[in-house]
């Protein structure tokens, strides 16, 4: 029996989501479009298999084939990131980070991460996250120019003396200097942990410097700029740390791994290792630069005055409207983005004074410089007259026509 026959409610809602993804423009920086091949294996019989433990050391029988699958995923991950050890079992980026903390430090130890309002992530010590409850957290941020001042980070690190420094961000548009972070970590005897969830796809294509050999441990999601399934990974070059990480993930915070997702990670890594991937990642950056340049030409303020990666962060501190207003206006025009806090924030996290925009998903659809210039100017038009609902509707129809030339999926399920 087909899903349409068995559960028409879910079938219909899934197809409505397909329509939304195809007709609208996805510009949330952390979202992307994965491969049909990735979705195909995620919907396979591999979901039936319990495989607690690791390849060759399982707590269940019948794991001979899933052992081969997980080993293949591990080997591809190691090759992709040019590292010696990889754990592909984390169910998410947040759980990967949780596993890193559990492996490297003890509850109550101090961690130093980027302030959430300056572009960091919840799992880098934010008080509302378990990382800020189980561990004592302190923060560095960006300066008024929107960039990290590494001397300031050094001063904070020497004063606070954390056991672990987290580098990586969810809304930072500039290159991260991993070598400088390692210098600082070494000066105070701390671990350096790089969370590259947002930039991993650029890193493996050579479009952003790698955290190896500087970071003791590296984590990432496998979706976002990697375009794989939703999940997490942890990498290191240190055998002893690898053992601790493995124990922290299982049996520490997870039970049976999701073998259908691990297989999908392996498929995604195969794509990431291809020459086609390098072309894609380069275009992601090029498109982001077009977006940044058009918005600045149209007199909008960008945090750090541009971008080096896949995203731009707009600041509305000089405008009457908020990030939430901008988010809603773009949404009405068929562009999905997200409100975001900015340095010098004056509004609540639910309102914000910023907007984060990314190019990975549009690039996956085939958008290049010409299309990005059109989209960027429409964004500026909308934000120049943020309450004009008629304009938003007109632009929505124009963008719908544009999107129809770049259909990425013909059906909702594979």
Curated annotation (Swiss-Prot):
Q: Establish whether keyword Transferase is in the entry.
A: yes
| This protein's record includes keyword Transferase | yes
Major place of residence: cytoplasm
The cofactor named in the record is: pyridoxal 5'-phosphate
Annotated site residues (Plays an important role in substrate specificity) in this chain? 223
Give the EC number(s) under which this enzyme is classified: 2.1.2.1
Q: Which GO terms describe its molecular function?
A: glycine hydroxymethyltransferase activity; pyridoxal phosphate binding
GO cellular component annotations of the record: cytosol
A single GO BP term for this record reads: glycine biosynthetic process from serine
- The enzyme's first-digit EC class, named in words, is transferase
The pathway is: One-carbon metabolism; tetrahydrofolate interconversion; Amino-acid biosynthesis; glycine biosynthesis; glycine from L-serine: step 1/1
Keyword terms of this UniProt record: Amino-acid biosynthesis, Cytoplasm, One-carbon metabolism, Pyridoxal phosphate, Transferase
Catalysed reactions, semicolon-separated: (6R)-5,10-methylene-5,6,7,8-tetrahydrofolate + glycine + H2O = (6S)-5,6,7,8-tetrahydrofolate + L-serine
NCBIfam families named among the record's database cross-references: PRK00011.1
Q: Which PANTHER family match?
A: SERINE HYDROXYMETHYLTRANSFERASE
Per UniProt, subunit arrangement is: Homodimer.
Q: Which protein are we looking at?
A: Serine hydroxymethyltransferase
List the lineage, top down: Bacteria, Pseudomonadati, Campylobacterota, Epsilonproteobacteria, Campylobacterales
């Amino acid at each position: 029996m087909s899903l349409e026959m068995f559960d028409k409610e879910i079938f219909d809602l899934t197809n409505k989501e397909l329509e939304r993804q195809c007709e609208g423009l996805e510009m949330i920086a952390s979202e992307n479009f994965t491969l049909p091949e990735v979705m195909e294996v995620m919907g396979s019989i591999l979901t039936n298999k319990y495989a607690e433990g690791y390849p060759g050391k399982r707590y269940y029988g019948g794991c001979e084939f899933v052992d081969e699958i997980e080993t293949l995923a591990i080997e591809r991950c190691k090759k992709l990131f040019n590292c010696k050890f990889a754990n592909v079992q984390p169910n998410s980026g947040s759980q990967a980070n949780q596993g890193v903390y559990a492996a490297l430090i003890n509850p109550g130890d101090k961690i130093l991460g980027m302030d959430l309002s300056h572009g960091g992530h919840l799992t880098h010590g934010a008080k509302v996250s378990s990382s800020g409850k189980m561990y004592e957290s302190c923060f560095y941020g960006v300066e008024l120019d929107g960039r990290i001042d590494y001397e300031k980070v050094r001063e904070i690190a020497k004063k606070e003396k954390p056991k672990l420094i987290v580098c990586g961000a969810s809304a930072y548009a500039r290159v991260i200097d991993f070598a400088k972070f390692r210098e600082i970590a070494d000066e105070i005897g701390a671990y350096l942990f790089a969370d590259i969830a947002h930039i991993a796809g650029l890193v493996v294509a050579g479009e952003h410097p790698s955290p190896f050999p500087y970071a003791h441990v590296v984590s990432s999601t496998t979706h976002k700029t990697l375009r794989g399934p939703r999940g997490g990974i942890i990498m290191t070059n240190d055998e002893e740390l690898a053992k601790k990480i493995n124990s922290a993930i299982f049996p520490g915070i997870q039970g049976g791994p999701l073998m259908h997702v691990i297989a999908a990670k392996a498929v995604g890594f195969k794509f990431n290792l291809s020459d086609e991937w390098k072309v894609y990642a380069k275009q992601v950056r090029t498109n982001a630069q077009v977006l940044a340049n058009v918005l600045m030409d149209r007199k909008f303020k960008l945090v750090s005055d541009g971008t080096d990666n896949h995203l731009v962060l707009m600041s509305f501190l000089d405008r009457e409207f908020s990030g939430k207003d901008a988010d809603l206006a773009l949404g009405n025009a068929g562009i999905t983005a997200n409100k975001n806090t900015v340095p010098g924030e004056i509004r609540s996290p639910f309102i914000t004074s910023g907007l984060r925009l990314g190019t990975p998903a549009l690039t996956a659809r085939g958008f290049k410089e010409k299309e990005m210039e059109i989209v960027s100017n429409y964004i500026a038009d909308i934000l120049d007259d943020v309450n004009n609902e008629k304009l938003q509707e007109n632009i929505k129809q124009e963008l719908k026509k544009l999107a129809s030339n770049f259909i990425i999926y013909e059906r909702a399920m594979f």
